[in-house]
Amino acid sequence: MNLRRNISRRRMIEGASAAALVTAAAATVPAAMASPETAASGPGLPKGNWRIDTHAHYSPDVYNDYLKRYGLLGAITGAYGPWSVDRHLAFMDQYRIQASVLSFGDLQVTVGPVDDRRATARAVNDYARDLVQTRGDRFGIFAVTPMPDIEGSVAEVDRALGELDLDGICLLTNYKGTYLGDPSFAPLYEILNDRGAYVYVHPTGPDQNPAPKLCFGPDIPAGNNVFEYTFDATRAMTSLIYNGVLRDYPNIRWHFTHSGGALPFLAYRLATRHSAFPPFNEVLPEGPLKYIKRLYFDDAQAFTAAQLQPLSSLVPADHIMFGSDWPATRHLYAADNVETMPFLKGSLPILKAGDPEPTVDEIYSRRQRIALERDNALDQFPKLKARIRRAGSR
């Protein structure tokens, strides 16, 4: 596999539909934990930092050293430059984000000898523990594993969710073409199920060499993130459903990105296949929709009515959360985003207003929006919620 060719640079931003931002004053509430009742009773949103970002990435030095060993640093961080705690906090403050739950995106710790991958996962998760101990009111973290090394991953999950007390685990949609529903992953799912773990799944590209050709022409070096991320997430969710993982391990909470990729559009098409293909009923007689409703999603780069309405019709409202995908989306959140994307004027994040997704107002009430951008996440991350409350009481 040509790693440089297949690792995405995330340089293109997915489209968004036009909308206007509705703004108004709100009662002042503590930044550490704004009250939903106070906010919902008035016409505006809470003041101060109140959002919870469930899709945000980080790249500490210990991880950068790992990437350098395999010549991959530029492929992963080249699109958005070096990451730092201060830089991330500055972005969060600009968009009124109280806390970000950090994770790795594409690649994670999948390259190199197994001993190096295990050691890197341990070192990264130790860094994560230290960051949470010092800034736990601003950051949660999904621990990384040395997948597809099952034995090493089981050990690291046990350590990360126990000794290190991190908020969840991050995985990829496939590992060298093996999707998450594969029976070989059963030992990992057993410990995740026993722990009642929250598992954040970031898409990667399909294991194809050469990579699927896109239709942009030779002068646009777009990677897997434009199309294949959404399609691969759909493959992974389908794999989990039809291989019985969601049925057999009901305590695992699965989180997928980008408003569900192609799944909201394809869900009912998938369900109707049961009438045409008897094997579908033999494998999953109850159908797929009940399991889709169990999944959790963020709306990173997918916060318009065209994207959120289909998802909202498919899953419970409290299963959808805010995600920024920062810093990979730094151009989307920049002050000059209208200049670089004038065709999206009216639907882009508004830096001056500190609003990362103004189009949400098209389909949600303010109370619903506060739930999407904060409360739903706090319900799923009790450790983070407790850390925020402790910080607010100081």
Tell me the role of every PLM-derived stretch.
Residues 52-56, 100-102, 141-143, 169-171, ...:
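Hydrophobic faces of well-ordered beta-strands that scaffold small-molecule active sites
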Residues 2-30, 41-50, 54, 62-99, ...:
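Mid-to-C-terminal alpha-helical segments outside catalytic/metal-binding sites
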Residues 57, 204-205, 241, 260, ...:
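Catalytic metal-binding/acid-base residues of hydrolase active sites
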Residues 34-36:
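Sec-dependent signal peptide cleavage junction
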Residues 48, 57-83, 118, 207-231, ...:
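Active-site gating loops and adjacent loop-to-helix segments of metal-dependent hydrolytic enzymes
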Residues 98, 102-237:
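Active-site gating/metal-coordination segments in enzymes
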Residues 164-167, 194-197, 251, 293, ...:
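Glycine-enriched alpha-helix->loop->beta-strand junction motifs that scaffold or abut catalytic
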